[in-house]
Amino acid sequence: LQGLPGKDGETGAAGPLDPGPVGERGEQGAPGPSGFQGLPGPPGPPGESGKPGDQGVPGEAGAPGLVGPRGERGFPGERGSPGAQGLQGPRGLPGTPGTDGPKGATGPAGPNGAQGPPGLQGMPGERGAAGIAGPKGDRGDVGEKGPEGAPGKDGARGLTGPIGPPGPAGPNGEKGESGPPGPSGAAGARGAPGERGEPGAPGPAGFAGPPGADGQPGAKGEQGEPGQKGDAGAPGPQGPSGAPGPQGPTGVTGPKGARGAQGPPGATGFPGAAGRVGPPGPNGNPGPPGPPGSAGKDGPKGVRGDAGPPGRAGDPGLQGPAGPPGEKGEPGEDGPAGPDGPPGPQGLAGQRGIVGLPGQRGERGFPGLPGPSGEPGKQGAPGSAGDRGPPGPVGPPGLTGPAGEPGREGNPGADGPPGRDGAAGVKGDRGETGPVGAPGAPGAPGAPGPVGPTGKQGDRGETGAQGPMGPSGPAGARGMPGPQGPRGDKGETGEAGERGLKGHRGFTGLQGLPGPPGPSGDQGAAGPAGPSGPRGPPGPVGPSGKDGSNGMPGPIGPPGPRGRSGEPGPAGPPGNPGPPGPPGPPGTGIDMSAFAGLGQTEKGPDPIRYMRADEAAGGLRQHDVEVDATLKSLNNQIESIRSPEGSKKNPARTCRDIKLCHPEWKSGDYWIDPNQGCTLDAIKVFCNMETGETCVYPTPSSIPRKNWWTSKTKDKKHVWFAETINGGFHFSYGDENLSPNTASIQMTFLRLLSTEGSQNVTYHCKNSIAYMDEETGNLKKAILIQGSNDVEIRAEGNSRFTYSVLEDGCTKHTGKWGKTVIEYRSQKTSRLPIVDIAPMDIGGADQEFGVDIGPVCFL
């Protein structure tokens, strides 16, 4: 039977002022079963006319549906372009409340919103700091459908919140991020007009709420731009005519809404706002609802299934980033209303949740305590269609869902009985604009016709004149979410609002520019003495002190490694052949253990040394004399290794070794091999047996006396003999027949085996000053010498780098030859020997010099 229309909903609180940008497209949910009658959506943009279908067979008349219970009025949607009347979709479940977003900057005045349902009275809370958006909580299962009840009472009006201190109008701030849709607040007293805010971004779509009664028809919107061409839906059966609603106030034009995807058409619902008349099509029986997308055959509508069992309640999750959808929890028991907590910090916008199935209407429960936001539940699979349940009692007002996107335009059908799908029709021509039609009477239900295939899409018809409000059709099934529509044009600037309240205190301004310098002040009194300043940088390095005296001799080092075995000595003279003896018994071989003690006379007597032929037990023959001579030669060689004699064949390591082994020997030339190894690279040196010094001769040992350098400049500077003077050379040491590389290696080992070095150089001069200048009394013209590690050794300065003079006979220009003997001693053996010399007082035609290079001695 035809139910009675529900009573009008109350005028809701003013909606949000800031039309936000179009949000991202949500995931497509599975189509749910047909829900109860939802609120009429905003008029959609006119779509192109679908292709006319073939005439279907009349279908059976359906039973009129029951009048749905009264629902709440939703938030006003963004103004879309006027279009043909779209099919009614089911009301979505209410979304979980989002956390408060940060206060947006002042923007232009938004359009008046529709009246929201009255909410529970909350305590006014303090302004909270902006926080992170919590994830969406699980949606509880809808309770079983109860018997139809009387319309519920109006909710109590909320307390008026405290008015903040009036502040100056702030500048337009940047556009804030859009937060998720929040819960419906209590209707407060009308506040002072707010500052104009920037358009905010729309929040994600919430779950569809239970269907409500028809609200007041909205004001007619201005003509919008034509929307995109939508797929044609099959027309539904015509319902009874509803009474037209009173004319609403004209709202401010909002931004153009995004285009939604076409949903499958449902049964004819109550009349919505009058849309623009679509182009007339051929009179065909309405086909069954088709699925969104490309045209195909519709399947038969399934039987409505029973409501599924409620799922278990999910635990509240910590507030954090949006996680994956959780399972649907059971609805909790309604608790007593608690006081509103202070607003939480602004959270980040959570991810858009999956659209769930609309549930059955539950009984009105007590308001529960606000729970923490849970994680979004997983998308449930669509249930099988169940039998229609008895009407339930009027439930409490649900949370206002966000405005749905406009559906695509459907084909206008002639008022006829529902038929089955006809065969696919050919594409029709574009229709002419139709005149304004009068409201048609409800058609008689026809017999069910066979389902025809979907006809081809026709050309878009011309826009018809505004028709009167059509009869209300039953609620259609919720369509699939449409693709993201293009962003609408920005609405016109609204009228200036009244002066706002005083704002919060502004932030401290930036540092001002420095002012002009003031006049100079009077001289102040002398201040107290300041603290001592930081320590200054270190001063330049002072001249080096004199060399310290030689330290005490160190302890005797560990014994060196055992020496190499000596070369075999010369074979002794052959002995006289003895008479042949009688053949003896087989011998047993020589006991080689006798060789083990060779040379170790300190550990016992030499067995060979005290063995005589007459002591042999008959095993030794006459040729044992040769063995004895060989053993003596080996013994002598071992002794020579242990006590080197300094010969070329048996060189010592240093002269100090020769002095230790042979303290009675005299000074003279000996052979040494500091790097050991093969004796072929031994060098001949002079050994001072008084001190144990090893002195290596230079090659050559002198620089001829002549005029080596001629310079026309009066500025005197040091001239290095080897580097600068033509024909000069670095001083080298060792035997002439040894390669310089071999001598250099032996000198390196000799320096490592020594603790001190010394060398003399004699400078022969003719009209050239070598050390002291008798005329000036200073050493500015003294010669420089260079050590083997490239260090320069001077006449004055750091004592570690200065030489001494044993004799100075080159102090003035006499025209005669003189000489100056220079000596340098150092415990830094790497500085010796001397490799170059640099006189300064040369360059004149009468200035000559020569050098005698003494041996370098290491101790």
UniProtKB/Swiss-Prot annotation:
Domain Fibrillar collagen NC1: 625-859
Residues the record marks as site: Cleavage: A613, D614
Cellular component terms per the entry's GO annotation: collagen type II trimer; extracellular matrix; extracellular region
Transmembrane segments: none
Annotated segments matching region Nonhelical region (C-terminal): 587-613
Disulfide bridge positions per record: C655-C687, C695-C857, C765-C810
Keyword NAD on entry: no
Glycosylation: residue positions: N760
Annotated Low complexity bias: 78-121, 204-220, 249-277, 306-321, 520-529
Subcellular location, record wording: Secreted, Extracellular space, Extracellular matrix
Chief place of localization: secreted
InterPro entries according to UniProt: Collagen (IPR008160), Collagen_superfamily (IPR050149), Fib_collagen_C (IPR000885)
Family: Belongs to the fibrillar collagen family.
Domain comment, as recorded: The C-terminal propeptide, also known as COLFI domain, have crucial roles in tissue growth and repair by controlling both the intracellular assembly of procollagen molecules and the extracellular assembly of collagen fibrils. It binds a calcium ion which is essential for its function.
Name of the protein this chain belongs to: Collagen alpha-1(II) chain
